[in-house]
């Protein structure tokens, strides 16, 4: 992952400071800033930006003027976080397409940056959100450009327009946009040829296309591997095409990536999406605070919820699974649905970055091995009968020969079948707890409907204290419910089901679920197998 090493180094610098027992203000603070600046420079972030960030952090923490009661370590952490956010946030609002009218989006960028693939990714992204989308290939310079766009668009089931005979890209773009406007398409994305700041003819061609289609938004596609050249190239494109947004591609690689971030400061233009892989679904919405949180290992739960909602949208089976879990039931079919949802969400490394604390747990896992193990689990499910899938797994205990039959039918081993069933038992136990908690919350809601709520809440708090439940640690199995104000929100139906749950995954505690899943994908599984194999 791009900038992963940068995140580790910055995190280590801040953690070293916060772990020290005595804060030697000057020495510890200067050492931390020095390490952060060295990490940013090694990640190809522009030198002037690093110097500016250094001054900003120093000026925002004035030890002499702080009251004695202030937690200086927390203040330093916040200063570092805020300055890193400002590094990637130009405070410019990007264009937002409107439904019911044609929104023309034009892509520009260097050759090989991934424009054509990103065009299809963005079209698919908007298509999944209810927009009527289309693609126009105005790249008449590169051999095979139209064929590539045609192949991608066909795969994503998106209408496209291009020409194998017309060589003037401005004419092709104008014809394509006019055609799709007439057919009332809401998002029309125009792909153009890759160009370099030294190629004046291609830059002139770009302005001609822009004049022909009058786009509502022009997007610069920037390769994360470009390094220090990013600032000069993006400035040249800004002067000619005046783009209003940036998409950074190839962020799943191991390049430094800081150069692309420098382009934000150089052009005062917001990053709107990150390309996180070669597949059409590998496009993440960029949000500065969430990006820095992930960079520092703090997770991005809001992004995860949005991702899960997009994947499980309108899924009848996901709704059925949620209903089962809310009742404390978890069948093998429900488990299969959860595995399918996780596979749709992308590689485990991508998901783990969104969950606080889980990125370290999955650091050594190979995504390809992990996805293969998930596929083998699906093979096992597909070899089960309807009665086995809709059961609770007890029939396998009563008739172990069923495991042998399933292993033979799925091309797996008996040990793998045993591991899957063991994992299901753990998940079923979690579902049972979620169902029990929901019933308790319903009883508490009913109890609070009449009478003095404050008195009833105080009485409940006393009972919890007597049971050892009120110490700020929250209820068992319900993360983040430490204070009573949050409890009131949940009692009134505002907190969602289960505190740590997510739609499409049945409201279960996803962090626990993913931790167990990563264990299984890492080879150990849930344990509990008797070691037999075939």
From Swiss-Prot:
GO terms for cellular component: cytosol; endoplasmic reticulum; signal recognition particle, endoplasmic reticulum targeting. Coiled coil: none annotated. Gene3D superfamilies: P-loop containing nucleotide triphosphate hydrolases (3.40.50.300), Signal recognition particle SRP54, nucleotide-binding domain (1.20.120.140), Signal recognition particle, SRP54 subunit, M-domain (1.10.260.30). Fungal signal recognition particle consists of a 7S RNA molecule (scR1) and at least six protein subunits: srp72, srp68, srpA/srp54, sec65, srp21 and srp14. Belongs to the GTP-binding SRP family. SRP54 subfamily. This is Signal recognition particle subunit SRP54. Residues 1-296 are annotated as: G-domain. SUPFAM superfamilies: Domain of the SRP/SRP receptor G-proteins (SSF47364), P-loop containing nucleoside triphosphate hydrolases (SSF52540), Signal peptide-binding domain (SSF47446).
């Amino acid at each position: 992952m791009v900038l992963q090493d940068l995140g580790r180094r910055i995190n280590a610098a801040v953690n070293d400071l916060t772990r020290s027992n005595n804060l030697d203000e000057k020495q510890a603070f200067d050492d931390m800033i020095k390490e952060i600046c060295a990490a940013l420079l090694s990640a190809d972030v522009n030198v002037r930006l690093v110097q500016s960030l250094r001054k900003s952090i120093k000026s925002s923490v004035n030890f002499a003027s702080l009251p004695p009661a202030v937690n200086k370590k927390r203040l330093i952490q916040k200063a570092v976080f805020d300055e890193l956010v400002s590094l990637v946030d130009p405070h410019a609002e990007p264009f937002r397409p409107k439904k019911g009218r044609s929104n023309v989006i034009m892509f520009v960028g260097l050759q090989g940056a991934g424009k054509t693939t990103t065009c299809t990714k963005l079209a698919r992204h908007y298509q999944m959100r209810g927009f009527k989308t289309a693609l126009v290939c105005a790249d008449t310079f590169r051999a095979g450009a139209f064929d590539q766009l045609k192949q991608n668009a066909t795969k994503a089931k998106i209408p496209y327009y291009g020409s194998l005979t017309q060589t003037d890209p401005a004419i092709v773009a104008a014809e394509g946009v006019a055609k799709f406007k007439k057919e009332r398409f809401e998002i029309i994305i125009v792909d153009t040829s890759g160009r370099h700041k030294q190629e004046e003819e291609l830059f002139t061609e770009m302005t001609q296309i822009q004049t022909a289609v009058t786009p509502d938004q022009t997007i610069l596609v920037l390769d994360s591997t470009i390094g220090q050249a990013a600032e000069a190239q993006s400035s040249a494109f800004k002067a000619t095409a005046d783009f209003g947004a940036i998409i950074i591609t190839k962020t799943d690689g191991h390049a430094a990536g800081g150069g692309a971030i420098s382009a934000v400061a150089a052009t005062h233009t917001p990053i709107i999406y990150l390309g996180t892989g070669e597949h059409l679904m590998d496009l993440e919405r960029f949000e500065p605070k969430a990006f820095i949180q992930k960079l520092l290992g703090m997770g991005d739960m809001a992004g995860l919820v949005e991702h899960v909602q997009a994947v499980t949208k309108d899924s009848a089976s996901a709704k059925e699974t949620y209903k089962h879990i809310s009742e404390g039931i978890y069948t093998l079919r429900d488990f299969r649905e959860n595995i399918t949802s996780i596979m749709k969400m992308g590689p485990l490394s991508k998901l783990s970055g969104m969950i606080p604390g889980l990125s370290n747990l999955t650091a050594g896992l190979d995504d390809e091995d992990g996805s293969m193990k998930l596929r083998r689990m699906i093979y096992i499910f597909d070899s089960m009968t309807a009665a086995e899938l809709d059961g609770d797994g007890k029939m396998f205990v009563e008739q172990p020969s069923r495991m042998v039959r399933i292993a033979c039918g799925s091309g797996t081993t008996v040990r793998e079948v045993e591991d899957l069933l063991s994992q299901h038992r753990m998940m079923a136990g979690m579902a049972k707890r979620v169902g029990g908690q929901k019933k308790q919350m319903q009883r508490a809601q009913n109890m609070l409907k009449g009478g003095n709520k404050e008195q009833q809440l105080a009485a409940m708090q006393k009972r919890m204290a007597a049971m050892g439940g009120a110490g700020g640690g929250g209820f068992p199995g319900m993360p983040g419910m430490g204070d009573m104000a949050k409890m009131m929100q949940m009692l009134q139906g505002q907190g969602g089901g289960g505190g740590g749950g997510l739609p499409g995954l049945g409201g279960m505690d996803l962090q626990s679920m993913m931790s167990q899943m990563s264990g299984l994908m890492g080879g150990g599984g849930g344990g509990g197998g008797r070691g037999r194999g075939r």
